[in-house]
Curated annotation (Swiss-Prot):
Interacts with CCNL1 and CCNL2. Its main location: nucleus. This is Cyclin-dependent kinase 12. The modification Phosphothreonine is found at T57, T515, T693, T894, T1245, T1247. Residues 253-277, 599-616, 1072-1084 have a biased composition (Polar residues). GO terms for biological process: cellular response to estrogen stimulus; mRNA processing; negative regulation of intracellular estrogen receptor signaling pathway; negative regulation of MAPK cascade; negative regulation of stem cell differentiation; positive regulation of transcription by RNA polymerase II; positive regulation of transcription elongation by RNA polymerase II; regulation of MAP kinase activity. It catalyses: [DNA-directed RNA polymerase] + ATP = phospho-[DNA-directed RNA polymerase] + ADP + H(+); L-seryl-[protein] + ATP = O-phospho-L-seryl-[protein] + ADP + H(+); L-threonyl-[protein] + ATP = O-phospho-L-threonyl-[protein] + ADP + H(+). The lineage of its organism: Eukaryota, Metazoa, Chordata, Craniata, Vertebrata. ATP binds at residues 734-742, 757, 815-820, 1041. Belongs to the protein kinase superfamily. CMGC Ser/Thr protein kinase family. CDC2/CDKX subfamily. The active site is at D860.
Length: 1491
């Protein structure tokens, strides 16, 4: 039967353990009795060694029973118990060290040669005990049967090991076995009688069998497996495994803490543990386990208090498992623990001690969790679990560093031990369990089983057992062959694994961040235990143990044991056990990791913990029983860990120990988690691990807040948290983070620029902000050229004592980056070429791919979190929302992450089990934004955001996204109508390779969306060579950050001209805006292209005016709105009449020419002229807006080509006329026109300037209009007086800044217009999007037209549908929507992002749009004619209503207003206008639209 086979594999360990554990089955009682007799013989031999190990009193049994429940709770609360457990572990380790000292030589030789004999003696003793136990209950009988099978095998293995081991184990174990067995039989009878009836008892019985199998060499190799797949391996008792798990997990905690304390407190408790190991012969069992059988005795027991502690732990756990008085005893260890106990007791007293350890709360926890994990298939999980365990036990940083050091030490020690022990004993000797290893197959398997039992039964036992388990695991790892030989050994190892997994689970909780590293460590460890991996599967144990058995002979090398003694007795034992479990665990664990994600986390911890875990487990179980005492252990733990690490071949094990030890340190040092790579801060025992002792420094300097990042050893010179913020000269504030401000500062020592991110603590209820902790832990693990580098942490206190006065603040010190992408796009100071966009995206996706491969989700990718320096280097920043991602884990995450504009549809629909695809969607939004200069999806509500996404990417439906129906909000957030995917049409203006990538990144179905790695292989990015890319021409005189951009936008809105910072910025925007404003008015009429063209000048005006309009009073805005509304009735002839153009046939011709020019894509100039025309029209009541629109388009063309003077004149005329029409609005316009008119001279009728401008550039307009324009807008005969009055009022109302901005706009557009025209033609192709790009983002618009264009863009996108009037209405809606967006900080131009804004979206803003505006939209022609200024004013008003906030929004609003006039035009114009807008980029000061 598989269990007996495993038992046989365990021979030594399983025989004794089975005697104790098997009592449950009646059939097995005879076999178990026979084996018990054998065990007793072995125990007699071992008793000599066992006596040295420590005397275990029968009391241990009762304690064990008490401890069992404790063990369960310990599993649950291993985190909190980690620290208190250390004390108990120290004691155990000391005992173990003592035992090691006495038993090292014996164990080494006996371990290899006499382990079989020992196991036989132990088996005999345990069989005797088993018989007694069987008498107690049928459960005990069944367990004994399992034990007997294991004892038989263990006897065989013992023979292989050597008679020396047998003699030791038998002598010691017999004495202990007799006592313990008697007590155990009594307890087991009591407990098992209750358990027998339950199915749990059967499961446990089966579990004991599996444990027995594991106890032997098999167990060792398997014990890692066993931890997770005890029951699976024990095919006989899946339920048994689950029982062990269940019990381990809950009750043992409470019991563990109390029992563990008692163990710690009294030597009697240690003796109890010992007695527990053998059923009731604790002394013999303890001695044997201490000397040879238990990895503890070899590795950590040598003379370490561990041996005593563990013996007490064994006693408790033995009493627990034997008597099973407590429900935990029944569930967990009645049958499984009994088998474990009997196995470990009868084969080797040392295993008993291990058992007691396993019984100890921590240990039992481990065993139960392991068995559960085994059941679930935690083999794959194991690797994950061990890393997780480490984090749970201690602070992530400390444990990680410790683990690293210990791993290194373990690797070195493993080599040394391997040489000494010929490979197999390497691990055991390291853990001072080499003697135990000699008895290893039988004793260790028994111990492991016992350890598992004890873990379940009592935390204290767990502590003791963990060392044994670790040693066994290490033995199995070191002696992969030995493990194969000894199936029983593997099973014990598995038990250890189970225990380790329990420990690791809590650790995992603690050190979530450390988990990745720990997982790596566990993976590293996993390779050494490959033989164990073979043995881990339930069937494998039988098969694989034989291969491992041959290595057992090498186990004897005594030198390994001597190494162990240096380890601090308490911690070494524990760490050794952990190490063993880790070593064994890795093979099985890795397979299990996939199966059990959470368990996998714990198991990797166990593996990593193998070194650290010993301390961790010791710390955890002890913590459970007595939290305070274990705290002192951490210092010892490091040494022990180091010792363990040298003994343990797998370097990851030492890391675990380091982690275990460091946990306490970690409590003091938050940043320590990244230290994981560093190694144990205090590894005195392991000089080799010390080699990796950056953590040592933290130990030396405990006040350290942060340890250097793994790759930053050099920076250890100035320890994190050691410096004060006064070492920096703060230059200014550059941002506002989630938990404080961000400052630009200069290091006084080095002179380098840094960014200081302030973490304020005064308002923190929880102490240090969790987001800051998470960011620190994650950033210390991410070292990449495209990820921002955190240099150190400083405080605002000179002395640590100052924190008593007030909490103060911490500062995270980052490398300084000159700009962020949002600030640059919104500034309008930069125009990115296709190559620049390629470079940015390549760097961004490389950084994201790195994060995803490290299993981190960023969860907040947006333009303001993408930093650039002046050399064009991009870095991903702000990891405050980032978190570790486990693909095997099914736990939900919050979906309230990622800024709304960049949030993917699955999060909007309520997905909580998302993948890294969420970050790819955000990067796709940024790719579109780089081309369009504005966010492509700008909504202020989740429903509106989903609507925008649906309009561009199609509605989410099962046809394209099969799993969408499973999402919580799929039915509640369905769009009002179904949309088809229009992304390729909307973005047809971008290169095809970029379009393909954008299409793939913005796929609705996250499972079909490309990964970050795939984006790097796309045609757009695969051939990009960053080294050959020319850096973009970034503004070196101005750092463009989000905060600066927002301030600038607010100033623009408030009317304060921000020309000074970069005058070029203001002038560019203004110029462009002026141009766009006029075209917008034109666009309002029928021709969409002219609308766009007009939008550009109008927007420019709006922006030039934009600043003015921002400055306009509400009354002025209202006047503008009224004018625009009244203009709806205007026709082209009416407009001409109003403008006095009707009298001139040339004007009519010009109007026709304007229409042609509109067709010719001369939107920019025509828009400007139109706005001029509109001004006169407005003064004339804007009756002929339609006419004006066409002429203005024509004029716009001419104006674009016309000289800057013409542009200025036209703008001035438009402004003056607008002012005339409405004195409030007119006053603003007057101011502009005055400034413009100064150069222009007389303000002729706007018609004249328009005609001139149109005629000059296109040469279509009659020269009449053109000449008046350059000198100044000649006032039309009727309008001039009005214009003058308006102008006079306007200058008064307008700020000088506004006038200056207008002038700049005029001058700049002049230069820009020619370029605009060609661009316009190009833009025509993309139409909506092309228009959109310029106005796309307020900050995105490089040129003024774009700024003004944002509103237009919105309109144009609507016009994309090509509905002129509906477009105008939608434009109004968009406008309103954009206004609301600007509230959000988006620019209306942002909203303008053409296709993004749809009627539904507009509805949101629509409410905000004044009715007049709507009417204006209804009357696009009037608007167009109504003078761009009035339109701009009206739009500005709208945006103000919408609280566009940014001045750019106002400007863009005006531009949009024009667009409203001609939505249909807007689409045509959009294309036209788009080109010019791009040229205007310099002027495209982003129209100050709110981001």
């Amino acid at each position: 039967m598989p269990n007996p086979e495993r038992h046989g594999g365990k021979k030594d360990g399983s025989g004794g353990a089975s005697g104790t554990l098997q009592p449950s089955s009646g059939g097995g009682s005879s076999n178990s009795r026979e084996r018990h007799r054998l065990v007793s013989k072995h125990k007699r031999h071992k008793s000599k060694h066992s006596k040295d190990m420590g005397l275990v009193t029968p009391e241990a049994a009762p304690l064990g029973t008490i401890i069992k429940p404790l063990v369960e709770y310990d599993d649950i609360s291993s985190d909190s118990d980690t620290f208190s457990d250390d004390m108990a572990f120290k004691l155990d380790r000391r005992e173990n060290d003592e035992r090691r000292g006495t038993d090292r030589s014996d164990r080494l030789h006996k371990h290899r040669h006499h382990q079989h004999r020992r196991s036989r003696d132990l088996l005999k003793t345990k069989q005797t005990e088993k018989e007694k136990n069987q008498e107690v209950s049928s459960k005990s009988g069944s367990m004994k049967d399992r034990i007997s099978g294991s004892s038989k095998r263990s006897n065989e293995e013992n023979e292989d090991y050597g008679k020396a081991q047998i003699s030791k184990s038998s002598s010691n174990k017999e004495s202990r076995s007799s006592k313990l067995h008697k007590e155990k039989t009594r307890k087991e009878r009591e407990l098992k009688s209750g358990h027998k009836d339950r199915s749990k008892s059967h499961r446990k019985r089966e579990t004991p069998k599996s444990y027995k199998t594991v106890d032997s060499p098999k167990r060792r190799s398997r014990s890692p497996h066993r931890k997770w797949s005890d029951s699976p391996k024990q095919d006989d008792s899946p339920s048994g495994a689950s029982y062990g798990q269940d019990y381990d997990l809950s009750p043992p905690r409470s019991h563990t803490s109390s029992n563990y304390d008692s163990y710690k407190k009294s030597p009697g408790s240690t003796s109890r543990r010992q007695s527990i190991s053998p059923p009731y012969k604790e002394p013999s069992a303890y001695q044997s386990s201490t000397r040879s059988p238990s990895p503890y005795s070899r590795r950590q027991r040598s003379v370490s208090p561990y041996s005593r502690r563990r013996s007490s732990s064994y006693e408790r756990s033995g009493s627990y498992s034997g008597r099973s008085p407590s429900p935990y005893g029944r569930r967990r260890s009645s049958s499984p623990f009994m088998s474990k106990r009997s196995l470990s007791r009868s084969p080797l007293p040392s295993r008993k001690s291990m058992k007691s350890r396993s019984r100890s709360p921590a240990y039992s926890r481990h065993s139960s969790s392991h068995s559960k994990k085994k059941r679930s298939g935690s083999r794959s999980r194991h690797s994950s679990i061990s890393p997780v365990r480490l984090p749970l036990n201690s602070s992530l940083g400390a444990e990680l560093s410790r683990k690293k050091k210990e791993r290194a030490a373990a690797a070195a020690a493993a080599k040394m031990d391997g040489k000494e022990s010929k490979g197999s004993p390497i691990f055991l000797p390291r853990k001072e369990n080499s003697l135990v290893e000699a008895k290893d197959s039988g004793l260790e398997s028994k111990k492991l089983t016992r350890g598992v039992k004890l873990e379940k039964s009592a935390p204290d036992t767990e502590l003791v057992n963990i060392p044994h388990l670790n040693t066994e695991v290490k033995n199995s790892l070191d002696t992969g062959k030995v493990k194969l030989d000894e199936n029983s050994e593997k099973h014990p190892i598995k038990d250890l694994k189970a225990q380790g997994s329990r420990d690791s689970k809590p650790i995992a909780l603690k050190e979530e961040i450390v988990t990745p590293k720990e997982t790596e460590t566990s993976e590293k460890e996993t390779p050494p235990p490959v033989p164990a991996v073979t043995s881990p599967p339930p069937p494998l144990p039988t098969t694989s143990p034989p291969p491992q058995t041959p290595p057992l002979p090498p186990l004897p090398p005594l030198p390994a044991i001597p190494q162990q003694p240096p380890l601090p007795p308490p911690q070494p034992a524990f760490s050794h056990v952990l190490a063993s479990s880790t070593s064994t665990l890795p093979p099985s664990t890795h397979p299990r990791t996939s199966t059990l994600s959470s368990q996998a986390n714990s198991q990797p911890l166990a593996q990593v913990s193998v070194k650290t875990q010993v301390s961790v487990t010791a710390a955890i179980p002890h913590l459970k029983t007595s939290t305070l005492p274990p705290l002192p252990l951490p210092p010892l733990l490091p040494g022990d860990d180091d010792m363990d690490s040298p003994k343990e071949t797998p370097p990851s094990k030492p890391v675990k120990k380091e982690k275990e030890q460091r946990p306490r340190h970690l409590l003091t040092d938050l940043p320590l988690p990244p230290e994981l790579p560093g190694g144990d801060p205090s590894p005195p025992d392991s000089p080799e691990p010390k080699a990796v002792t950056p953590p040592q420094q933290p130990y030396k300097k405990r006040p350290k807040i942060c340890c250097p990042r793994y790759g930053e050893r050099r920076q250890t010179e100035s320890d994190w948290g050691k410096r004060c913020v006064d070492k920096f000269d703060i230059i200014g504030i550059i941002g506002e983070g989630t938990y404080g401000q961000v400052y630009k500062a200069k290091d006084k020592d080095t002179g380098e620029l840094v960014a200081l991110k302030k973490v304020r603590l005064d308002n923190e209820k929880e102490g240090f902000p969790i987001t800051a902790i998470r960011e620190i832990k994650i950033l210390r693990q991410l070292i990449h050229r495209s990820v921002v580098n955190m240099k150190e942490i400083v405080t605002d206190k000179q002395d640590a004592l100052d924190f008593k006065k007030d909490k103060g603040a911490f500062y995270l010190v980052f490398e300084y980056m000159d700009h962020d992408l949002m600030g640059l796009l919104e500034s309008g100071l930069v125009h990115f070429s296709e190559d620049h966009i390629k470079s940015f995206m390549k760097q961004l996706m490389e950084g994201l791919d790195y994060c995803h491969k490290k299993n981190f989700l960023h969860r907040d990718i947006k333009c303001s979190n993408i930093l650039l320096n002046n050399s064009g280097q991009i870095k991903l920043a702000d990891f405050g929302l980032a978190r570790l991602y486990n693909s095997e884990e099914s736990r939900p995450y919050t979906n309230k992450v990622i800024t709304l504009w960049y949030r993917p549809p699955e999060l909007l629909l309520g997905e909580e089990r998302y993948t890294p695809a969420i970050d790819v969607w955000s990067c796709g939004c940024i790719l579109g934004e780089l081309f369009t200069k504005k966010p492509i999806f700008q909504a202020n509500l989740e429903l509106a955001q989903l609507e925008l996404i649906s309009r561009l990417c199609g509605s989410p439906c099962p046809a394209v996204w099969p799993d969408v129906i499973k999402l919580p909000y799929f039915n509640t957030m369905k769009p009002k109508k179904q949309y088809r995917r229009r992304l390729r049409e909307e973005f047809s203006f971008i290169p095809s390779a970029a379009l393909d990538l954008l299409d793939h990144m913005l796929t609705l179905d996250p499972s079909k969306r490309c990964t970050a790695e795939q984006t790097l292989q796309s045609d757009f990015l695969k051939d990009v060579e960053l080294s050959k890319m020319d850096p973009p021409d970034l503004p070196h005189w101005q750092d463009c950050h989000e905060l600066w951009s927002k301030k600038r936008r607010r100033q623009r809105q408030s009317g304060v001209v921000i020309e000074e910072p970069p005058p070029s910025k203001a002038s560019r925007k203004e110029t462009t805006s002026g141009t766009s404003a006029e075209p917008v008015k034109n666009s309002s009429p029928a021709p969409p292209q002219p609308a766009s063209g007009k939008v550009e000048p109008g927007t420019g005006d709006a922006i030039g005016l934009g600043d003015i309009t921002q400055q306009l009073n509400q009354s002025e805005l209202a006047v503008l709105l009224n004018l625009l509304q009244s203009q709806t009735d205007l026709s082209i002839p009416q407009m001409a009449q109003l403008l006095n153009i009707h009298s001139n046939p040339e004007m009519q011709q010009q109007l026709e020419a304007l229409n042609q020019s509109i067709s010719a894509l001369t939107e920019a100039t025509s828009q400007q002229q139109d706005s001029e025309h509109m001004a006169p029209e407005e003064s004339l009541k804007e009756a002929p807006p339609a006419l004006v629109v066409q002429p203005s388009a024509e004029q716009t063309t001419s104006e674009a080509s016309s000289t800057p003077a013409d542009m200025q004149n036209m703008l001035a005329v438009l402004l003056s006329q607008l002012m005339k029409t409405q004195e409030p609005a007119g006053s603003l316009e007057e101011n502009n026109s005055d400034k413009n008119s100064g150069p222009q001279g007389p303000r002729r009728t706007p018609t004249m300037p328009q005609e001139e401008a149109a005629a000059c550039p296109p040469h279509i307009l009659p020269p009449e209009k053109r000449p008046p324009e350059p000198p100044g807008p000649p006032p039309p005969p009727p309008p001039p007086p009005l214009i003058e009055g308006d102008l006079s009022s306007a200058p008064q109302e307008l700020n000088p800044a506004v006038t200056a901005a207008l002038l700049q706009l005029l001058s700049q557009p002049e230069a820009e217009p020619p370029g605009h025209l060609p661009h316009e033609h190009q833009a025509l192709r993309p139409m909506e999007y092309s228009t959109r790009p310029h106005p796309n983002r307020t900050y995105g618009n490089t040129d003024g037209p774009e700024t003004g264009f944002s509103a237009t863009d919105t309109d144009e996108r609507n016009s994309g549908p090509a509905l002129t009037e509906s477009l105008t209405q939608t434009l109004v809606k968009n406008r309103t929507f954009s206004g609301s967006v600007s509230h959000l900080g988006e620019s209306s131009s942002y909203q303008g992002t053409g296709s993004v804004q749809f009627p539904g979206d507009q509805d949101l803003r629509f409410a905000r749009v004044p009715l007049p505006l709507h009417s204006v939209v209804g009357q696009p022609f009037l608007k167009a004619e109504g003078s761009s200024n009035s339109v701009v004013h009206a739009e500005t008003k709208l945006q103000n209503y919408g609280e566009l906030g940014p001045g750019t929004t106002g400007a863009s609003s005006s531009g949009a207003g024009l667009n409203w006039g001609g939505s249909a035009q807007s689409s045509a114009y959009g294309k036209l206008y788009r080109g010019p807008t791009r040229v205007p980029p310099r002027g495209g000061r982003g129209r100050g639209v709110p981001y």
